[in-house]
Amino acid sequence: MKYEIQGEPMPVVICDLESGEPMITEKGSMVWMSPNMEMETSAGGLGKAFGRMFSGESIFQNIYTPRGGPGMIAFASTFPGSIRAVQIDPSHPIVVQKSAFLASEAGVELSVFFQKKIGGGFFGGEGFIMQKLSGHGTAFLEIDGHAVEYNLAPGQSIVVDTGNLAMMDATCSLEVRAVKGVKNMIFGGEGIFNTVVTGPGRVVLQTMPLTAFAGAIASMLPYKQ
């Protein structure tokens, strides 16, 4: 596969494929393709389908394969931001926000990732259930807003508002913690829970998660009873 990412802040990734070379994507990500692309919808097995449903994703995934020669297919972001290509291999799985996966080569496997410490997880918003990408191949991630990357040393931590965590290496650990102090919770305006990511590993943060954008817009709309 060869690919090119174009057009921030509303990006698209255009993939050129060899005949018979499949790609997988979530429902609704394809925006254009060559006529010889064949689509097949698959749940990928009961366990994987249940996991995607539990994480809030579509049960089904679409598999696109060029037939009779090379093909082309394009996948677009659903929100202003960027598309990031990440290389996955068996020794380098990653964990991503459940809405971040856009498309990948067929060798990439998706599964549900749970925090080991779930004390505040049920209330921590988007960070409780995430997706793990493993296997082998290139995956394309959808980043809301601008992407900022940090490389954490072993034991080094960063505190993140939960929705702003877009991706981390699977070597990192994740914990949702309540904000200290009742006054801070009530009057701080920063939410009740934060996510603490601890290295070693890479962390990619996003500056404008969709939930924050939707909340800002909703606060400006006239209230109707």
Predicted region positions:
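Composition-driven recognition of glycine/serine/threonine/acidic- and proline-rich low-complexity segments
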Residues: 1-225
